[in-house]
A protein has these predicted regions:
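Acidic-enriched and Gly/Ser
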Residues: 1-96, 113, 118, 122-156
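Short, charged beta-turn/beta-strand-edge "cap" motif at the junction between a beta-strand
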Residues: 101-105
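Short beta-strand-centered aromatic/proline hotspots
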Residues: 106-114
Length: 156
């Protein structure tokens, strides 16, 4: 009997520098969490209750917590077919983050902190009815003025 359509653990591409070079690494987006997609939540809940000791589902207020529609839509926009948030290419233009390409496009209001040296953006997102902090990879090759950015865009 199939109770789950898909079981996955979302990840993100990050960069790590070792041996003098930057390397892409895949990291867990929500360490310790596994997501289960199912059309029959009641049947899934019953099945999971019988797996005592094997799995501890997220329970808030005594029950299993499904992801809300808007939370699910946000995650689907960020994740690719492999359930991974890929690297974004961004610029800082006159002190503001401008996303050139990648999953952060249109989501700069969620960015709380940028670490250019580690090539990481810390985001605040809504998940399980609460604000959660996540990290995603990004590349910021330069800080530019508006004129420099427009000149660069015109050249490409």
């Amino acid at each position: 009997m199939e109770v789950a359509d898909k079981i996955f653990s979302p990840s993100y591409e990050g960069m790590h520098k070792y041996q003098g070079e930057w390397h892409i690494e895949i990291n867990k987006l929500f360490p310790g969490y596994v997501f289960i997609q199912s059309e029959n939540a009641d049947q899934l809940e019953t099945y999971l209750e019988h797996l005592s000791g094997t799995v501890t589902p997220v329970q808030i207020g005594g029950g299993f917590y499904p992801i809300r529609t808007e939370e699910q839509a946000f995650l689907k926009e960020m994740l690719d077919a492999d359930d991974c948030v890929r690297y974004s290419l961004d610029y800082i233009v006159d002190g503001k983050l401008v996303v050139e390409r990648g999953p952060l496009s249109g989501k700069t209001d969620h960015v709380r902190k940028i670490d250019r040296h580690k090539r990481i953006a810390n985001l605040t997102i809504r998940l399980f009815g609460q604000d959660r902090q996540i990290r995603v990879g990004l590349e910021i090759p330069a800080r530019l003025t508006v004129a420099e950015y427009q000149q660069q865009k015109a050249a490409t």
